[in-house]
From Swiss-Prot:
Reactions performed catalytically: tRNA(Asn) + L-asparagine + ATP = L-asparaginyl-tRNA(Asn) + AMP + diphosphate + H(+)
Assigned protein family: Belongs to the class-II aminoacyl-tRNA synthetase family.
Name by which UniProt lists this protein: Asparagine--tRNA ligase
The protein's Enzyme Commission number: 6.1.1.22
Keywords tagged on the record: Aminoacyl-tRNA synthetase, ATP-binding, Cytoplasm, Ligase, Nucleotide-binding, Protein biosynthesis
Length: 466
């Protein structure tokens, strides 16, 4: 007798006639007049539960089996048999069922066997993984993460663990969480009355990182091809379906690479990870297509077979102006494209994923390479039908004098970036990279619109429960 996951039984990897044990939680219990109970046992290894057929001849049938409710944890031992009923190919004919844990009060159990609103599930985030929806999201999230690591490994990239605590503002926007051990009720002060951060833990101001990019560049300029994959933080007071204060980012950096090189990398990576989900999580994707977004599977299949379009920002503005479409946000050269503009380009005009390149320098970060026209930088956004921007990237500015000028132009102190500037002083090379918001990616794949529902414990303004 061996302990096996539910998925092995349902997919036929446990031989018919073999004796196995499965462990999990009760989804439902149905009793027949013939003295047989059908207990659906779920262990999270796949979307569907396994049906255990329990006969009333078991010694604990009356006292325990007939009292099982949704959420009880059980260990079921039995024989794998072909299922005569619809809905599953295999089931277990139980020879023993051990109740590991009871639900204290089934009437008040927060995850009772009914459909719950997505808003309610956020209030019980510690229990919501037990639902079909969040369980499926968790498995897809895992598959996407593994596919990302696998893609980069197969293509010769090294994973770099960049720091979560930093003294640098990658985006130059100032929306950072401060890290401090100072006593807020007794702050040390300088002669001018400012907070004296030299007395703080790090001897200077420190923050939670908004991006691993700058640190990633240091390793790209030694190992050639690297990527970071970890949490990032933005103290942006935005209560929208697209924003989180804590989220995960995938950020490759490539030495000797142009903007076009990383645009090609982005296309290759997205198609790889989407195909992995289609291949490995068909059961979960079927659920999303049936219950969340009927286009979920077809959207990914179209994506992996599409050729990416490419367009300069200036030409994209002309396309929008000539569209005859009435947008909520006015269109003019110099604006940052809004979601409605991005989706028009991807869904209506190109009808395919599109890479928009060469944005105005005034709406982009200091580290992006200045183009010869002096007005634009070598930046790109990958726009996907159905969501808009899914990746943002650029060729990095490798010329020290130009980088210094950009820092000054944006009011940033170049001394704070002394180590970043050193990369331009000692064997500088053209290099490029991009950032992919992992939760935005999961939202696109699953059709779950709010990013708060695709991360285990969302962190948003005035919300840090659990």
């Amino acid at each position: 007798m061996s302990v096996v996951p539910v998925v092995d039984v349902l997919q036929g990897r446990a031989a018919v006639g073999s004796e196995v044990t499965v462990r999990g939680w009760v989804r439902t219990r149905r009793d027949s007049k013939a003295g047989i109970s059908f207990v659906a046992v779920y262990d999270g290894s796949c979307f569907d539960p396994l049906q255990a057929v329990v006969n009333n001849t078991l010694p604990n049938y009356q006292d325990e089996v007939l009292h099982l409710t949704t959420g009880c944890s059980v260990e079921v031992t039995g024989t794998v048999v072909a299922s005569p009923g619809e809905g599953q190919s295999f089931e277990i004919q139980a020879t023993a069922i051990n109740v590991v844990g009871w639900v204290d009060d089934p009437d008040t159990y927060p995850m009772a066997a009914k459909r719950h609103s997505i808003e309610y599930l956020r209030e019980v985030a510690h229990l919501r993984p037990r639902t079909n929806l969040i369980g499926a999201v968790a498995r897809v999230r895992h598959t996407l993460a593994q596919a990302i690591h696998r893609f980069f490994d197969e293509n010769g990239y090294f994973w770099v663990s960049t720091p979560l605590i930093t003294a640098s503002d990658t985006e130059g926007a100032g929306e950072m969480f401060r890290v401090s051990t100072l006593d807020l009720e007794n702050l040390p002060r300088t002669d001018t009355g400012a907070v004296d951060f030299s007395e703080d833990f790090f001897g200077k101001e420190a923050f939670l990182t908004v991006s691993g990019q700058l640190n990633g560049e240091t390793y790209a300029c030694a190992l050639s091809k690297v990527y970071t994959f970890g949490p990032t933080f933005r103290a942006e007071n935005s209560n929208t379906s697209r924003h989180l204060a804590e989220f995960w980012m995938v950020e490759p950096e490539v030495a000797f690479a142009s903007l076009d090189d990383v645009a090609g990398l982005a296309e290759k990576m997205l198609k790889y990870v989407f195909q992995a989900v289609l291949n490995e999580r068909a059961d979960d994707m079927k659920f999303f297509a049936e219950r969340v977004d009927k286009d979920a599977v077809d959207r990914l299949q179209r994506f992996v077979t599409s050729d990416f379009a490419q367009v300069d920002y200036t030409d994209a503005i002309e396309i929008l102006l000539a569209s005859g479409q009435k947008f909520e946000n006015d269109v003019s050269w110099g604006i940052d494209l809004s979601s409605e503009h991005e989706r028009y380009l991807a869904e209506k005009h190109f009808k395919a994923p599109v890479v928009v390149k060469n944005y105005p320098k005034d709406i982009k970060a200091f580290y992006m390479r200045m183009n010869e026209d002096g007005k634009t930088v070598a930046a790109m956004d990958v726009l996907a039908p159905g969501i808009g921007e899914i990746i943002g990237g650029s060729q990095r500015e490798e010329r020290l004098d130009v980088l210094d000028a950009r820092l000054a132009e944006m009011g940033l102190n170049k001394e704070d970036y002394w180590w970043y500037r050193d990369l331009r002083r000692y064997g500088t090379v053209p290099h490029s990279g991009f950032g992919l918001g992992f939760e935005r990616l999961i939202s696109y794949v699953t059709g779950v619109q709010n990013v708060r529902d695709v991360i285990p414990f969302p962190r948003t303004p005035r919300n840090a429960s659990f």
